[in-house]
Design a protein with these regions (language model features):
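Secreted, disulfide-rich extracellular signaling modules
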Residues: 1-262
Length: 262
């Protein structure tokens, strides 16, 4: 048996109805409930990322991963939860005042082309932002500016291009025509339930990655992680619920990766 790791080439957390960019933050925070710097009555975030699959494909072609693309080869996305180290963190407040989320489902979806399964691929940039909130006082002391609205964000993929639908897709299936995409048309790669909210991400990407290796799937520009629409659309909450996972900028051995086992 051989095990191979593929790492992220870029990642970002986009926030509902906001131009903020947090692409260089070491933690991605998925939240829902009362809005954090977004438009009422509810707010939420979605995480997007891409994988550098070139080394994996080259190792398969060279025979280093000898089984090639067979049913025996599996691919699992692994991300470490920032609350997985201390059970005392359950049901407590995070540093921003949000409550650690429990009992929820996350989806892993493929970033769609401009009209769903057709059209042009949506290429996007990671961005240079860090914080959700601008803090000019820190800038005046000579610290690196942590707040940025440079793309990507909820609306933009790059400086001169936008998502075909703000936030990538509509979670209430209200998009029409070829300019947007509904949740019902997304390619859902996997879904994971979190009972306590301190579990690590373990998404099964076996079929998705194998289809890229064989050429069955082309033009992929990455994937996203989000709460299921039923959670994103909850209104009337008076608190914010959140869960955090380490991103590629963690600078620790908790860096996220795709694990290939053959």
């Amino acid at each position: 048996m051989s095990i191979f790791r593929s790492y992220f080439s870029k990642n970002n957390t986009i926030q509902k109805n906001s131009f903020v960019n947090t692409g260089r933050n070491p933690v991605m925070q998925l939240f829902y409930g009362t809005s954090l710097q977004t438009t009422a009555p509810n707010g939420f975030t979605r995480f997007i990322f891409d994988l550098d699959l070139t080394p994996l494909i080259e190792n398969i072609a060279s025979g280093t991963i000898s089984t090639g693309c067979t049913s025996a080869m599996t691919h699992t996305l692994k991300m470490t939860n920032t609350s997985s180290f201390d059970i005392d963190l359950l049901n407590t407040e995070a540093s921003d005042g949000s409550i650690r989320a429990t009992s929820f489902d996350l989806i892993l979806f493929r970033i769609p082309k401009t009209s769903g399964s057709t059209g042009n691929s949506q290429t996007w940039d990671e961005g240079v932002g860090y914080d959700y909130v601008d803090t000019p006082a820190l800038d005046s002391w000579g610290f690196n500016k942590a707040f940025s609205t440079r793309p990507s964000n909820w609306y933009q993929t790059t400086t001169i291009t936008n998502w075909s639908y703000p936030g990538i897709y509509s979670n209430n299936n209200t998009s029409s025509g070829n300019t947007g995409l509904n949740y019902s048309a997304l390619t859902i790669v996997d879904t994971q339930h979190f009972e306590f909210g301190n579990e690590d991400i373990n998404f099964d990407m076996t079929h998705e990655i194998n289809s890229i290796i064989t050429g069955s799937t082309t033009g992929s520009t990455g994937w996203g992680i989000a709460y299921v629409p039923q959670i994103e659309n909850i209104t009337g909450l008076t608190v914010t619920y959140s869960v955090g996972f380490f991103t590629r900028h963690t600078q620790t051995f908790y860096q996220p990766f795709l694990q290939t086992t053959a």
